[in-house]
């Protein structure tokens, strides 16, 4: 199955869930930030994806932790995480797939 951008979706059984404990980067410091929490968290998630894709720790089509897991770990609302994910989805780092979760995408192939 492909989406509107031409990404091929693997079968659900082929997808690997990335646990919150798998994240190799330190959590962001959300105190004294100049931008919104959503943008700061979005940039942090994008940096984590870039770093861990390059190192091979995560792979394309990995399912990132749930919004609730991120919100709990970062001490913010699920809405803040939802906005952060929307921000990085627009940049091509992830793609939300209903009934599956949010998948890591190859951000280097964006036009």
Model features per residue range: what roles?
Residues 2-79, 83-95, 100, 106-111:
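Extreme N-terminal segment that seeds HTH/winged-HTH DNA-binding domains in transcriptional regulators
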């Amino acid at each position: 199955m492909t989406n509107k951008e031409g990404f091929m979706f693997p079968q659900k059984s082929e997808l690997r869930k990335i646990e919150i404990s798998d994240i190799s980067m330190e959590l962001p410091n959300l105190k004294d930030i100049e931008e919104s929490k959503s943008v700061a968290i979005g940039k942090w998630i994008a940096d984590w994806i870039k770093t861990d894709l390059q190192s091979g720790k995560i792979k394309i089509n990995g399912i990132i932790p749930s919004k609730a897991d991120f919100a709990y770990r970062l001490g913010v609302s699920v809405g803040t995480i939802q906005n952060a994910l929307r921000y990085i989805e627009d940049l091509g780092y992830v793609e939300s797939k209903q009934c599956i979760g949010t998948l890591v995408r190859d951000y280097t192939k964006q036009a």
